[in-house]
């Protein structure tokens, strides 16, 4: 998430050093957190033990990764001239291809992506759907359309985004993630839902990054 802010500031200030630092942050997050076999992102990494702790594919972690990576091509002018952007685009493509498999019948994703016993979680679902929408791949269209109904069903008449999990540490096991309450309004739920619906309104105007 910090890399996204750094990149935006770097582009606004025309600060190539800050842009490079932001892309470096993306690059090493990919190397340490994405499983190259599954395409999914782990919730955490222990640099001392050299492992992914409980090894859980947390939904919102995958949403943050997908959403922030999807923004780079539209923010960074001539993104294709930055070698690390190719890593970002490749990582995102593989992640979104993997996530499609785990979309539920309700058009949502679960708080533990690959755990059918964990609950559907709305901030993760909104972030993943927003990333698909921003990426602009026509193969994502049916998953995006399915998400619209699922997300709308979890927004109250007064605009509250419901069924958003609370702040979540790297839990010991899947049961720990299943136990995180989702009864309260959370800023990240409101924000990611707004990002999805706002992107939906301007989807025809999104700047794509070509064949990358």
Predicted stretch roles:
Residues 66-113:
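Oxyanion-binding "anion nests"
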Residues 40-60:
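Acidic/Ser/Thr-rich, low-complexity mid-to-C-terminal regulatory regions of eukaryotic proteins
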Residues 16-42, 88-107, 143-160:
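Long, well-ordered core segments of solenoidal/helical folds
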Residues 9-17, 51-56:
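Active-site cleft segment of glycoside hydrolase catalytic domains centered on the general acid/base Glu
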Residues 44-49, 108-116:
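Short linear capping/connector segments at secondary-structure termini
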Residues 109, 115-212:
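CBM-like carbohydrate-recognition segments
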Residues 2-15, 64-81, 126-139, 192-207:
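Well-ordered alpha-helical scaffold segments within catalytic/enzyme domains
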